[in-house]
Amino acid sequence: DIYSATADDIKERMEKGILDIALLMEPVDIGKYEFVRMPQREHWGALVCADSPLADKETLSPDDLAGQPIIIAKRESVQNELANWFGDTYDKMEIAATYNLILNAANMVRNGVGAALCFQMDNRYGDLRFIPLRPRLETGAVLAWKKNQTFSETSSQFIQFIKNSF
């Protein structure tokens, strides 16, 4: 099964033994886990309506987003990362909503709630436009599993494959 949720929810399921292996987006505390860092980095930007005043920009700076209603991820560690990117401008941010899955955020953008800060996706949202952040903000990912856990043969082989691949 593939299960989508925030890193915090997924780690909780791993601790309970419901999930064996997880792809976790950083920033994330992985002290309890063995992991392999994925080579691809994700780039942050804003998902905006095509008719937004921001839609004509090639990139967005903290000053461009100041005073605009913003939709951000609900994870505190991600919010802290974004606060660091915004710097002194963070105090001027208007946080309109938070999200746990990008599809929810895209629907909020579509309905005029604000611009969603998110990773660049291969998905096309028709009437929405992704605009990269400048200065560039990147996030990594790790494939993680509990230390010293006994896995099924299939899970063990998959972990070994991942270790050998990256």
Question: Can you annotate each of these PLM segments?
Answer:
Residues I30-R37, R41-H43, L103-T150:
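Beta-alpha-beta core module
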Residues E58, D63, A144-F166:
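Extended ligand-binding regions for polar small-molecule ligands
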Residues M14-L23, W44, D91, V109-A116:
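Alpha-to-beta junction loops
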Residues M25, P62, Q68-D91, F151-I159:
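Secondary-structure junction motif
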Residues K11-E12, D63, A106-N107, S156:
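Alpha-helical segments flanking ligand/cofactor-binding loops in enzyme cores
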Residues D1-I2, G87-A97:
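A local structural motif
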